[in-house]
Amino acid sequence: MRELTKRQNEIFEYIKQTVHAKGYPPSVREIGEAVGLASSSTVHGHLSRLEEKGYIRRDPTKPRAIEIVTEQLGEPINMEETIHVPVIGKVTAGIPITAVENVEEYFPLPEHFTSTHNSDIFILNVVGNSMIEAGILDGDKVIVRSQTIAENGDIIVAMTEENEATVKRFFKEKAHYRLQPENSSMDPIYLDQVTVLGKVVGLFREM
């Protein structure tokens, strides 16, 4: 295989480390941040050189689709299968949660992170500290299984009256529904009606 420049080697090593640690490759932005390149076009250029030299393969139709062809000793990397899960940026009343209008991007998750079919799963970026006592922190990505019903005590994603998605613990009580924060400094939300968008089944945190 053709020799790499210093910068190409830095990028290749970072891709390998990320694949080994997470099971999927980094994004162009993450590569740029790791090696000190502000321009995404410059990163794309280096990735093209790595591909030309036979170190990686890319699929232009998929995000983060970088496959390592070989390691230095010629051993193939055991790269875990991933699925591309929609990341929901907003919630629009009257249309499915994973409709194109709601999707900000697609995020690759190792297949073992989900126990159901890809079409039943979406990701929501957590904003705020209302669930910190359940271990769900600001900036986390919660993995959500689409469903319209919930049992008492489930952590769910619900639609508020302002058509925003909120993560809370669900309780159906005698005269109302209670959406309970997992933060002792915050009050519960009481609603006559609640729209359940899904149940939180996992969490992903980027360090």
Curated annotation (Swiss-Prot):
- In this chain's numbering, which residues are marked as the site (Cleavage)? 93-94
Highest taxon, organism lineage: Bacteria
Q: Which residues bind DNA?
A: 28-48
Name the residues annotated as catalytic in the UniProt entry: 130 (for autocatalytic cleavage activity), 168 (for autocatalytic cleavage activity)
The record's annotation in Gene3D superfamilies points to:
Umud Fragment, subunit A, Winged helix-like DNA-binding domain superfamily/Winged helix DNA-binding domain
Q: Enzyme group, top EC level?
A: hydrolase
Q: Which InterPro entries match?
A: ArsR-like_HTH, LexA, LexA-like, LexA/Signal_pep-like_sf, LexA_DNA-bd_dom, LexA_repressor, Peptidase_S24_LexA, Peptidase_S24_S26A/B/C
Q: Give the EC number(s) under which this enzyme is classified.
A: 3.4.21.88
The reaction(s) catalysed by this protein are:
Hydrolysis of Ala-|-Gly bond in repressor LexA
- Keywords associated with the record: Autocatalytic cleavage, DNA damage, DNA repair, DNA replication, DNA-binding, Hydrolase, Repressor, SOS response, Transcription, Transcription regulation
Subunit: Homodimer.
Report the protein's function.
Answer: Represses a number of genes involved in the response to DNA damage (SOS response), including recA and lexA. In the presence of single-stranded DNA, RecA interacts with LexA causing an autocatalytic cleavage which disrupts the DNA-binding part of LexA, leading to derepression of the SOS regulon and eventually DNA repair.
NCBIfam families of this UniProt entry? lexA
Protein's name in the database: LexA repressor
Name the source organism.
Staphylococcus saprophyticus subsp. saprophyticus (strain ATCC 15305 / DSM 20229 / NCIMB 8711 / NCTC 7292 / S-41)
Instruction: Name the gene for this chain.
Output: lexA
